[in-house]
Swiss-Prot record:
Protein name per Swiss-Prot or TrEMBL: ATP-dependent RNA helicase DBP5
Domain Helicase C-terminal, residue spans: 276-453
Coiled coil, from the record: none
Record organism: Phaeosphaeria nodorum (strain SN15 / ATCC MYA-4574 / FGSC 10173) (Glume blotch fungus)
GO molecular function annotation: ATP binding; ATP hydrolysis activity; inositol hexakisphosphate binding; mRNA binding; RNA helicase activity
Residue ranges annotated as motif Q motif: 64-92
Gene symbol of the encoding locus: DBP5
GO cellular component annotations of the record: cellular bud tip; cytoplasmic stress granule; nuclear membrane; nuclear pore cytoplasmic filaments; nucleus
Primary subcellular site in the record, as a coarse category: cytoplasm
Entry function: ATP-dependent RNA helicase associated with the nuclear pore complex and essential for mRNA export from the nucleus. May participate in a terminal step of mRNA export through the removal of proteins that accompany mRNA through the nucleopore complex. May also be involved in early transcription.
Family the entry assigns: Belongs to the DEAD box helicase family. DDX19/DBP5 subfamily.
Top class in the EC scheme: hydrolase
Length: 471
């Protein structure tokens, strides 16, 4: 399926802590466990400066090394400890602007898995005054899982900053009355808003507010309102930083109001998809055959780790029930689970105890598990109406694999004219090619996907990877 390919009829004719660090530290230019260097596909980050006095010719405007950023030795030690060797493209552009004094706001967009978390974490940690034992920075995320992951990265990166305190602000009935007095707080908008209103968070000294997956939070009426209320409860002169892989037009105007006079870093649509992710689709006769087709991929899914994305909680629960009943080991996570159960499931997945995770869009954004080599879109991502394609969610889903130079496979199931058209619309939006899988020989399908997964580097040319798929 290509962006220009005409619509065809398919064969025949539900809505949607620290333990994370070892997995999340691929969020920069580093080295994997085996010591071989990673590569980052070239892409262009467009920079729009709010402050016209900022000098693009200044050598610090584009930092080629972390040392150039004049970070403290404690922070540099933390960066090296996480195996970061040099800034990624987004870090190279964003960090000099984030670290300027006086601080300026930022709206930054970059591909999934390219170092956004490390960028805003370094900015947060660079501005913390350890002599003051009170909250100075808040980072918000749309899910507890992502909040815990970000907290782990910040804690690990700042491990050599003596006296640094970090805390999570996520739903927990046992800690509802706990005072949050750490230097850095990472949480979900609803919990942070409640704790601020109840004065369990002292806001006087907070100077940085970060929204990760900002477009997702600002675009949701409830969560967007919560983010706005959080900001209204903070000092007026705080630095506001918005990060995401996507900023659709409907959100960008609101983002500009939420973070006024921002430096803006953006990508074109066609630069958002990641070279190391091989995007495939499989045309299935009918919806009822999707489950049996999914089972054919179970062996491949368990060679490393895989995520199966579905549209509804009901589908997630049903897939888990059927697969477990047939002897397959899988885990399931959706918003229907209690917080502690969600923590248990994601920790099992990170540790490799569970290699296959069935989930809804609750985990489509930001979650970084290094071992994920395959993402399956059991349901094509759509808008709330279930009819219109959702390109941004597709991008975030497949971005759970192919993290920072690694290779991954994204496989989407289509089963009727509507789902085929939705996927075609997604391909057109990103101006990218999606390759069909020939299911006449399942042994050949398995061999082809194994070749892709076992590729040592995402730096293989598109031509080489396409030949693997089509040969």
């Amino acid at each position: 399926m290509s962006a220009t390919e005409p619509t065809k009829e398919p064969a025949k004719e539900e809505v949607a802590e620290q333990s994370t660090v070892a997995q999340a530290q691929v969020d920069g230019s580093g080295e994997p466990a085996n010591g071989s260097p990673l590569t980052e596909t070239e892409y262009k980050v467009e920079v729009k400066l709010a402050d016209m006095q900022a000098d693009p010719n200044n050598p610090l405007y584009s930092a080629q090394s972390f040392e150039e950023l004049q970070l403290s030795e404690e922070l540099l030690k933390g960066v090296r400890n996480m195996n970061f060797r040099k800034p990624s493209k987004i870090q190279e552009k964003a960090l000099p602007l984030l670290l300027m004094n006086p601080p300026t706001n930022m709206i930054a967009q970059s591909q999934s898995g390219t170092g956004k978390t490390a960028a805003f974490s370094l900015n947060i940690l660079s501005r913390i005054d350890l002599s003051r034992n009170e909250p100075q920075a808040i980072a918000l995320a749309p899910s507890r899982e992502l909040a815990r992951q970000i907290l782990g990265v910040i804690t690990h990166m700042g491990q050599f900053m003596e006296g640094l305190k970090t805390m999570a602000a996520i739903p927990d009935p046992t800690k509802r009355n706990q005072r949050l007095d750490a230097h850095v707080l990472v949480g979900t908008p609803g919990t942070v808003q409640e704790q601020l209103k109840r004065r369990l968070i002292k806001s006087d000294s907070i100077k940085i507010l970060v929204l990760d997956e900002a477009d997702n939070m600002l675009d949701q009426q409830g969560m967007g309102d919560q983010c706005t209320r959080v900001k209204s409860l903070l000092p007026k002169n705080i630095q506001t930083v918005l990060f995401s892989a996507t900023f659709p037009p409907a959100v960008i105007n609101y983002a500009n109001k939420f973070a006024p006079n921002s430096n803006v870093l953006t990508l074109a649509h066609e630069e958002l998809t990641i070279e190391g992710i091989k995007q495939l689709y499989i045309d299935i006769d009918k919806d009822q055959d999707k489950y049996s087709t999914l089972l054919k991929f179970y062996g491949l899914m368990t060679q490393a780790s895989s995520i199966i994305f579905v549209r509804t909680r009901r589908t997630a629960e049903e897939l888990e029930r059927r697969m477990v009943a047939e002897g397959h080991k899988v885990a399931q996570l959706s918003g229907a689970l209690e917080g502690q159960d969600r923590d248990r499931v994601i920790d099992q997945f990170r540790s490799g105890e569970a290699k296959v995770l069935i989930t809804t869009n609750v985990l489509a954004r930001g979650i970084d598990v290094e071992s994920v080599t395959m993402v399956i879109n059991y349901d094509v991502p759509t808008m709330a109406d279930g009819r219109e394609a959702d390109p941004e969610t597709y991008l975030h889903r497949i971005g759970r694999t192919g993290r920072f130079g690694r290779v991954g496979v994204a496989l989407t199931f289509v089963h009727d004219k509507a789902s085929w058209q939705q996927l075609h619309d997604i391909a057109s939006y990103f101006k990218t090619d999606l390759h069909p899988i020939d299911t006449s020989d399942w042994d050949n399908v398995e061999e082809m996907i194994q070749k892709i997964i076992k590729s040592s580097r995402a730096g293989k040319s598109t031509k080489e990877m396409t030949e693997m798929i089509t040969s």
